[in-house]
């Protein structure tokens, strides 16, 4: 069952019990998810049907279409039904229909509804076109890996965050030439809270760059070009968290992104987005990512920036179990689950390195197929660049000793400023030195029987199992109200975006769920 040799002497019966509890939690929540849709799920359907662009006021056409249907109390049937019916009635394309709605020339909800079977058949046939494009993107990615080969060992993941997509491209190309394997374009501060996706190439962001489809296209093009120069496929990463999770997943699938931040709980805890909204949105976004071959990264590392990494380690493991089960329900295979964790214990903690090693090895053994995402120290980086570089070196050592996969490079200037190109070069050099010098160390080391490292892992697993038992009894929504994750309490009916949640009609239809889950 477990392909990774167990060095921690973990109780795998307990692992299976914990996994079963997480599955029960996910299935319980999934019942709620499947009875509801949201405005952004329906906007994602519009985008996947080919609706794009903005009106004269810069309002995206998918928003105009979905708001129009919602105002006329029709969203419970799904946008696909109204668009397909309008195509049958008018002979126009979805894009032309959206433009007609924007111009006030068409009311989708007043058109005579054709036979429902005919409408669903039309929606399905229209959806197949985009699904084929996404399949094609997946095969392009696979053929590039066949051509260049894929790297074994940790992937060096770096971020660019200038606010200007053209400057981001300059920095990303430099990072790729320095040895980066994954480029993540950080989003501008607050984009999570926009209930629409901006349009076009952007040059003004704060702490990051707007996620737009054009920005995705530009960066993908640049990375393909530099990838051909350096002889490897450079993975591109962005963020589908916030109020537009499935829309950004759809845009990423269309533009061939490779990695997406896509956590089931992050938006609830750290962006105060309503929990009902987030749970529905994460499901469709993961269906899209699963189908597109995109690796998702989850955000457990964020718990450790608000809660103590030593005391709350079990909440990270419990969340990893839950994220895994929600991903499986959305058809996302284990090989695409970049479950997150982080090297965030206080450097003053005695034996802290051993505890970090235990936690990382435990994640590796419990999720043997997952391309685990391991985050660098940030919370206890002080601006002392020399100590910071050493903290990052210890983090790099844990990665290679425990075979982490997606290795987010720490920056020596963390807590001072967003990284300069020179900072990135030093961080890449630090990691490459350690990964090369210690390449086979994980095959050479065992942990002392009943020693500190084994005992710590057993203790964290037991606590995670107890927590999952508690969550199973309470249900996920009540658990989030109690503040168990990251010490953050959120009300079930509070937060942003609840007014965008709609109950489905019995004739509701989303053709992409059917096509993508039955791949």
UniProtKB/Swiss-Prot annotation:
Catalytic activity: (3S)-3,6-diaminohexanoate = (3S,5S)-3,5-diaminohexanoate; D-lysine = (2R,5S)-2,5-diaminohexanoate
Cofactor(s), names only, from the UniProt record: adenosylcob(III)alamin; pyridoxal 5'-phosphate
Uppermost EC category: isomerase
Keyword Isomerase part of the UniProt annotation: yes
Binding site for pyridoxal 5'-phosphate: 187-192, 241, 266, 271, 302
GO MF, one example: cobalamin binding
Pathway note: Amino-acid metabolism; lysine degradation
Keyword Isomerase: yes
Disulfide bonds: none
EC number, UniProt record: 5.4.3.3
Keyword terms of this UniProt record: Cobalamin, Cobalt, Isomerase, Pyridoxal phosphate
Amino acids binding adenosylcob(III)alamin: 57-59
Activity modulation: Rapidly inactivated in the presence of D-lysine and to a lesser extent in the absence of adenosylcobalamin (Adocbl). Activity is stable in the presence of Adocbl when D-lysine is absent. Adocbl imparts thermal stability at 37 degrees Celsius.
Superkingdom per UniProt: Bacteria
Quaternary structure (record): Heterotetramer of 2 alpha and 2 beta subunits.
Annotated family: Belongs to the KamD family.
Biological role stated in the UniProt entry: Catalyzes the migration of the L-beta-lysine and D-lysine epsilon amino group to the delta carbon to produce 3,5-diaminohexanoate and 2,5-diaminohexanoate, respectively.
Entry protein name: Lysine 5,6-aminomutase alpha subunit
UniProt organism field: Acetoanaerobium sticklandii (strain ATCC 12662 / DSM 519 / JCM 1433 / CCUG 9281 / NCIMB 10654 / HF)
Lineage: Bacteria, Bacillati, Bacillota, Clostridia, Peptostreptococcales
Gene that produces this protein: kamD
């Amino acid at each position: 069952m477990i392909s990774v040799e167990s060095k921690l002497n973990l109780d795998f019966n307990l692992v299976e019990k914990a996994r079963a509890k997480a599955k029960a939690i996910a299935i319980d929540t999934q019942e709620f998810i499947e009875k509801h849709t949201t405005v952004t799920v329906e906007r994602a359907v519009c985008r996947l049907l080919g609706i794009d662009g903005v009106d004269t006021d810069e309002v995206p056409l998918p928003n105009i279409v979905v708001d129009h249907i919602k105002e006329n109390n029709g969203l419970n049937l799904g946008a696909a039904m109204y668009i397909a019916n309008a195509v049958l009635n008018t002979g126009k394309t979805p894009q032309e229909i959206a433009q007609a709605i924007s111009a006030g020339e068409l009311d989708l909800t007043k058109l005579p509804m054709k036979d429902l079977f005919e409408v669903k058949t039309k929606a399905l046939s229209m959806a197949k076109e985009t699904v084929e494009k996404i399949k094609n993107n997946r095969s392009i990615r696979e053929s590039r890996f066949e051509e260049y080969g894929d790297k074994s060992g940790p992937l060096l993941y770096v971020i660019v965050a200038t606010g200007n997509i053209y400057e981001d491209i300059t920095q990303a190309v430099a990072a790729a030439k320095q040895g980066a394997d994954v480029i993540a374009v950080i989003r501008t501060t607050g984009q999570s809270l926009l209930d629409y996706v901006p349009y076009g190439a952007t040059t003004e962001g704060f702490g990051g760059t707007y996620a737009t489809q054009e920005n995705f296209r530009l960066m993908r093009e640049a990375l393909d070009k530099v990838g051909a120069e350096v002889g490897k496929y450079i993975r591109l990463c962005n963020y589908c968290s916030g109020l537009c999770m499935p829309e950004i997943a759809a845009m990423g699938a269309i533009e061939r992104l490779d990695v997406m931040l896509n956590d089931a709980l992050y938006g609830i805890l750290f962006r105060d987005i309503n929990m009902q909204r987030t749970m529905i949105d994460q499901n469709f976004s993961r269906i899209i990512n699963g189908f597109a071959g995109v690796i998702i990264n989850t955000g457990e590392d964020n718990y450790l920036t608000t809660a103590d990494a030593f005391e709350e380690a079990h909440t990270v493991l419990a969340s990893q179990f839950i994220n895994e089960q929600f991903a499986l329900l959305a058809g996302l295979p284990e090989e695409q689950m970049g479950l997150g964790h982080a090297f965030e214990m206080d450097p003053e903690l005695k034996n802290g390195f051993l505890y970090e090693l235990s936690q990382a090895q435990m994640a590796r053994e419990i999720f043997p197929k997952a391309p685990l995402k391991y985050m660098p120290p940030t919370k206890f980086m002080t601006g002392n660049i020399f100590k910071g570089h050493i903290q990052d070196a210890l983090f790099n050592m844990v990665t290679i000793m425990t075979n982490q996969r997606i290795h987010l490079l720490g920056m020596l200037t963390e807590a001072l400023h967003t990284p300069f190109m020179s900072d990135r070069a030093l961080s890449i050099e630090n990691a490459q030195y350690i990964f090369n010098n210690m390449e086979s160390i994980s095959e050479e080391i065992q942990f002392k029987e009943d020693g500190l490292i084994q005992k710590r892992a057993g203790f964290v697993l037991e606590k995670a199992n107890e927590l999952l038992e508690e969550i199973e009894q309470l249900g996920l929504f009540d658990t989030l109200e109690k503040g168990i994750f990251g010490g953050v309490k959120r009300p079930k009916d509070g937060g942003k975006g609840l007014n965008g949640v709609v109950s489905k009609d019995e004739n509701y239809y989303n053709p992409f769920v059917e096509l993508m889950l039955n791949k």
